[in-house]
Amino acid sequence: MQALVNKIWYQGHPLRWLLLPLSWLFAVITYVRRALFRLGIKSQTAMPVPVIVVGNITVGGSGKTPTVIYLIELLRQHGFTPGVISRGYGVDIQGVKTVNLGASAAEVGDEPAMIVARTQVPMVVGAKRVDAANALIAEFGVDVIICDDGLQHYALGRDIELVVIDGQRGLGNGLLLPAGPLREGAWRLDAVDFIVNNGGPAAKGQFEMQLAPTEVKPVKCDVTSGEYSFDKSQPLVAMAGIGNPARFFESLRAQGYQLALCQGFDDHQAYDKTLLRDLAQDLPLLMTEKDAVKCRDFAQENWWYLAVNAKLSPQFDEQLLARLREVAAAKQGNFHGIR
């Protein structure tokens, strides 16, 4: 099914025309919904600290999580105490839940588990971002909130909107769901503060981001530094349960890894030992960092993951920090109208 969807959204499959009436209906619904917030008919809750929303206007992964991690580290380096909120995709969370270090993906979602494992940032997940934001402030006293994937969650007031675009796939066929991958029309990009192009090249007004691979590490938690080595010249099986698995596989090939088999899974895929053991067939198994947090409890010795770090320009850092300081100085907890 996902293969057919990709053909419709990114390869010009003619089925998109049959779905176009549904896309028109979706466009009306999204426009009316946003208008209700802009007109004040539906309420938007402002936070007493600056809120940075990191999202996209397309379905699927675009590089939001590496961007969130980059922002966490950038803000810490400049004296801020950031915290993160998220929906916790694929997890049924009643109310809100604090993401503790070591929390499983089954409890809080794969991306929250990965973000906290990497950064130890204060983080709260919940279906209602406003409740999660209030809990984050009350429990941790953060001075900046980063909302991971909440661009269309207009009930939460925001001060800075940052959209991440997949530089390879772009906006696909440019159509709204279900005929295309768009959650909102391309016009929405004109209203955000920052557009980050993952993989570039960046268009005018955008900031290019590259994902730089780090060292390969074992998925199995009890294998400590210095007790392992990875030979990238050996044949291996690569797997990825992310929005665009092909990007991960292409990156591995470019780095010289010998891929005997590439297996893409749906984003947020749940795994079990039998599925992956049968896939690997005794060959080393190399996966993404997001996949690794879901496999630690049953990982074998020859299962590995490759983390990536986002790289952005000093100009991006300067402009975002300047905007954030401006917001922080003026913040009085009053309503911030949606733009």
From Swiss-Prot:
The name on file for this protein is: Tetraacyldisaccharide 4'-kinase
Q: Does the keyword Transmembrane apply?
A: no
The residues the record assigns to binding ATP are: 58-65
Instruction: Name the domain of life.
Output: Bacteria
| Catalysis performed (reactions) | a lipid A disaccharide + ATP = a lipid IVA + ADP + H(+)
Q: What's its job?
A: Transfers the gamma-phosphate of ATP to the 4'-position of a tetraacyldisaccharide 1-phosphate intermediate (termed DS-1-P) to form tetraacyldisaccharide 1,4'-bis-phosphate (lipid IVA).
- What is the annotated signal peptide range for this record? none
- Tell me what organism the protein belongs to: Shewanella baltica (strain OS155 / ATCC BAA-1091)
Gene Ontology MF, one: tetraacyldisaccharide 4'-kinase activity
Q: In which pathway does it act?
A: Glycolipid biosynthesis; lipid IV(A) biosynthesis; lipid IV(A) from (3R)-3-hydroxytetradecanoyl-[acyl-carrier-protein] and UDP-N-acetyl-alpha-D-glucosamine: step 6/6
